[in-house]
Each structure stands twice: as C-alpha cells, then as structure tokens.
Swiss-Prot record:
<feature type="transmembrane region" description="Helical; Name=Segment S1">
    <location>
        <begin position="138"/>
        <end position="158"/>
    </location>
</feature>
<dbReference type="GO" id="GO:0005886">
    <property type="term" value="C:plasma membrane"/>
</dbReference>
<dbReference type="GO" id="GO:0019904">
    <property type="term" value="F:protein domain specific binding"/>
</dbReference>
<feature type="transmembrane region" description="Helical; Name=Segment S5">
    <location>
        <begin position="305"/>
        <end position="325"/>
    </location>
</feature>
<protein>
    <recommendedName>
        <fullName>Small conductance calcium-activated potassium channel protein 2</fullName>
    </recommendedName>
</protein>
<keyword id="KW-0991">Intellectual disability</keyword>
<feature type="region of interest" description="Disordered">
    <location>
        <begin position="1"/>
        <end position="54"/>
    </location>
</feature>
<keyword id="KW-0112">Calmodulin-binding</keyword>
<keyword id="KW-0812">Transmembrane</keyword>
<feature type="intramembrane region" description="Pore-forming; Name=Segment H5">
    <location>
        <begin position="345"/>
        <end position="365"/>
    </location>
</feature>
<dbReference type="GO" id="GO:0016286">
    <property type="term" value="F:small conductance calcium-activated potassium channel activity"/>
</dbReference>
<dbReference type="GO" id="GO:0042803">
    <property type="term" value="F:protein homodimerization activity"/>
</dbReference>
<dbReference type="InterPro" id="IPR015449">
    <property type="entry name" value="K_chnl_Ca-activ_SK"/>
</dbReference>
<feature type="compositionally biased region" description="Low complexity">
    <location>
        <begin position="568"/>
        <end position="579"/>
    </location>
</feature>
<comment type="subunit">
    <text>Homodimer. Heteromultimer with KCNN1 and KCNN3. The complex is composed of 4 channel subunits each of which binds to a calmodulin subunit which regulates the channel activity through calcium-binding. Interacts (via N-terminal domain) with MPP2.</text>
</comment>
<keyword id="KW-0225">Disease variant</keyword>
<dbReference type="GO" id="GO:0098914">
    <property type="term" value="P:membrane repolarization during atrial cardiac muscle cell action potential"/>
</dbReference>
Amino acid sequence: MSSCRYNGGVMRPLSNLSASRRNLHEMDSEAQPLQPPASVGGGGGASSPSAAAAAAAAVSSSAPEIVVSKPEHNNSNNLALYGTGGGGSTGGGGGGGGSGHGSSSGTKSSKKKNQNIGYKLGHRRALFEKRKRLSDYALIFGMFGIVVMVIETELSWGAYDKASLYSLALKCLISLSTIILLGLIIVYHAREIQLFMVDNGADDWRIAMTYERIFFICLEILVCAIHPIPGNYTFTWTARLAFSYAPSTTTADVDIILSIPMFLRLYLIARVMLLHSKLFTDASSRSIGALNKINFNTRFVMKTLMTICPGTVLLVFSISLWIIAAWTVRACERYHDQQDVTSNFLGAMWLISITFLSIGYGDMVPNTYCGKGVCLLTGIMGAGCTALVVAVVARKLELTKAEKHVHNFMMDTQLTKRVKNAAANVLRETWLIYKNTKLVKKIDHAKVRKHQRKFLQAIHQLRSVKMEQRKLNDQANTLVDLAKTQNIMYDMISDLNERSEDFEKRIVTLETKLETLIGSIHALPGLISQTIRQQQRDFIEAQMESYDKHVTYNAERSRSSSRRRRSSSTAPPTSSESS
C-alpha cells in the first residue's frame, strides 16, 4: 500500500510513470483501461513516422503495469495487463478526433468521480444494513441453539435417555442452527472486510486480512462451533464429595462438556446492541466522535448505558448471570449429587446467590471442579457488581449541581443570620457589663460575672459561626463556581488581550514616528550642509554683484572724467583769454 496510489477505485504503482501518463490515467480510470500516451495523438495519418517511432519506443521501454479496476456494475476484481504493443490495440482510431476526446474527457472524468463517490456512499450504507441484519440473524440462531440445548439436556435427564430419537432430533436441530450460525458469522466478517475496503479505498480483500483479524475470526468460529453432537457418547467422571471427601466415580455424557460453552454465544448480544445503538448509527454522533478521537465500540456503548440507566443494566446483568450460573452448577453437579442438593435448580440458585453476594454460609458446597469454577467466576462477578451497585447508589444519593447551589445558598443565609445574632449578643453583653460597672452606684458582682460569662460565650459562638462560614465557602467551590471563576478569568484575559493589542498598536505607531524622526535626523546634516552651501553661494553671488557694480561705476566715472578732459583740451579760446 505504501508504494501504490489510489484514485477512483484503481491501484497503480507510482514508479515508471511520467507526469503525462499519470494525468492520462487519472482522466479516464473508471470505465476504460489505461492507455499509453502514443495512442492519444493517433489521428489517422496526422502524426509523422518519426513521432510514431518515438512513441512506440517509449511504450516498449516502459515496464508492464498491472491495474486493478473496479467497475460500477461488477463486484469482482478485474486484472488488466498492459505492456509492449499495447498502444496499437487501445490507440485512438478516428482520424482527427483526438483533440475532441481530450476536451470532453475532463467533464466526463469529473462526472464519473462524482458518480463513483455517490456509488461508494450508497454501497457503504447498504453494507451497514446488511451487517446489522446478519448480526440480528446470528443472535437469533445462537439463542435458538442455546434454548434447544437446555431443553434437550433437561428432557434427556428426566424424560428419556440420550439414545432416543427425540434426543437425536433435538441434537440435529442444534447442529443445523450451529451450521447456519457459522455461515452467518462468515458472511458477517465478509461484510466487515468489504466495509474496510470501501473505507480505505482498497480493491484487494487480502489487504484487510491481518493476523489479528484472522485470529479473532477463527476464535469466534471456534466458540460458536461448540455444541453437543448427535449421538450417545460417555466418559468416566471422578470427583471427591464435599463433606465426606469420599471419591465418586460415575459415567457422564460428553454433551455436558459441549453444552456449557454454548453460553459463550451470548457475546452476540453486545454486538447487536452496538450495531443498533443510536450513537453508532447516527452520522452526526459518529462525526463528532471522530473529531474527538472516540472509538464507537461495545465498551463505549456500555459506558453510555451505565451512565443513562445504571440500575436497569445492573439488574438485567445480575439476574441473567444468576440464572445461567445456577443452571450451569445444576448441570455440573447432577452426576455426583446423590442427595439432590446442588443438582436441584432452586438449591443451585441459593448457592449462586450466597456466592454472588460474597456471604458463603457453607451449607451448600459444589462437589466437582466444574461447579467450583462456576462459583469462582460468580464470586468475581458478584464483587464487581457489588462495587458498581455501591457506586451507582452513591451517585444517586449525591446532590445535583443545582441542589448543591441551593443548599449552599440556604446555609450561607443561615450562617449570616447567626453571625449577626452573635455580634449583637457581644454588643449587648458589652453594654450590660459597662452599665453594671460604670453607671450604677453599687456594683452587683454576681450580675457582672453573669454578663461576662455571656459575653465570652457570645465571642466563642461568633468565632465558631465564622469558622463554619469559612468551611462552607471552601466547600462551595463546585463546578458552578468554577464556571463563574472561569468566566471571570476569561473576561479578564480578554480585557488584558485588548489592552495588550492597544498597547502594541501604540508601540507600532511610536516606532513609526521614531523611524521617521531618525530618518529626519539622518537627513539633517545633509540639509544643513546644503543650506550652508546655498547661503555661501548666495553671499558670494551678492558680493560678486556688488563688486561688479562698483567696478562698472568706477569705469563709467573714469570714462566721464576723461571725456571732460578731452573736451576742455579741444575747446576754442574765448575773447577774454585772447585779450
């Protein structure tokens, strides 16, 4: 199973499969055998000879594959062997129809998978019903064989002997019911194996046949096959009498050895109870149990019954054990009980009852080891049933949660009143002592001692009532109070979680602001240097502009002065200068 892969009822090996071939197998695995990849593109003459040769080489080089498929309308397992040359027989033949088949294969495969899931669910439900019906029939035939065995044993002891035709007819009837029971058990386990295959997706029934399952099937068949066979067979039975210790030898029937183990068939009752239980048949309960990892077995059903109706279960079990053990002791002791003490059914019931209750008066003692073994098992069962009865009675006498809560509330109210009364008595006696010692002219010492005595009694009463109140508060920690405490703790934890989330948000905001501030601080030297450079550049530009203005002003001034000089040197002389 570890090296195979299950998909839609087909077990395929994972080795020697390429991705394209695996996809092809998954597309059409329910209705068709697996096809090699060379046949998918086989469109008449559309493919080239080189491609066909390469595909044929790929098919011939791949290892043979054994595919186990389960059709929807066939319960048998089909084996198909595909190897070299399989492409020609299964290849696509229709000219250019390969692309159309590839486009429609996806929807077909999805429909087939959905149909396969629905078929499996319906098949599983049918197997459940068949298994339940087989278990019912097996219980009917098993109980029928036990009843006929008891009738035959009683009639052969008092009415006729083992060699009569009546005994032979009844034994043949027991054998027939046993054969039918064995057939039903085999078919039941076959249904179990089919359910295992459906649940685990296996196609080979041999996968479910583990050594443990084989052992339990063989053990069940062996237990149910034991029955008194037709015919008269005897053996010599030697025992020692209880009170006289004298040996007793008699000829006994082999049927007594084969009849008593037939009561082991009663295990079928537990199986029927399991299969008819609402916890086992209800899908919702099984789903919840699977989520909680609970096994729905006979033990769980018995625990549920002991929780729901413990008294009824113990009563039915005790009475059934009492009757069966009494008849078994009677059957074991009838050959060596000469005084008809334990071989009498009422006497055997008395012996079983005093053994079951662990009393043991000693007035009746079994003679054979068979009777002693039955009494031993009865004593063990009685001890267990007594413990269960004590537990059930204690649980029935215990107060419920609501009753405990009401009782604690009433006791707390009464203790509160007693505390108030005791405190009032203390105050009253204190006032009376003060009055009789300070507010009177003549002190009455007897009255003062009386009030002092009452004062001390009131103090002790107040202390005892407060102690009872503390004990009640300690005992009041029931599941209801624990639930309240749990709710309070849940609210506190929720509040703390909300505060922690708010605190985390604030921390995240603070971290964001700190990161922004750190980024600004890291960018500050660059901004400062850039600002200083800009200011220096502006200052230098301003200085250069003022210098240029000064230079131009000086140049213009020198030009104007030179012009004046030139004009004065080139001007004609006036009349005053000439005279």
